[in-house]
Amino acid sequence: MPTVKIIGPYRFFFYSGDRDEPPHIHVERDNHIAKYWLQPVRLQNSGRFKRKELNRILKLIEENQTEFLEGWDEYFSE
C-alpha cells in the first residue's frame, strides 16, 4: 500500500489492488481510514471521521490533487 504523502497526522495512500477503480486516495489517522475520489474530489467513505475533520481533509486533498493523481498514474501505469 504505497504512501503518496504524509501531512501532519494524515497518511495519504492507495492499495495496490485499487487499479480497477477510478482514481482515489485513502487517508488514515489513528484507526480511521476515509476514501475520497480524485476527479472530482469528493468523499466516498467517511471512515468514521467527524464532519469537521472530513472538511479539513477535503481541503488538503484539493490542495494536493495534482500530486495524488500523478502518484496514482505513476504507480498504476507500471
Where are these regions (language model features)?
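Short, charged/polar N-terminal "headpieces" of proteins
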Residues: 1-21
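Generic preference for hydrophobic/aromatic residues in regular secondary structure cores
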Residues: 4, 43-45, 64
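Short leucine-rich amphipathic alpha-helices used at interfaces
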Residues: 5, 31-32, 75
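Compositionally biased, intrinsically disordered low-complexity segments enriched
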Residues: 7, 26-28, 66-67
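A short, structured beta-strand/loop element
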Residues: 15-51
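C-terminal structural segments of small proteins and small subunits
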Residues: 51-78
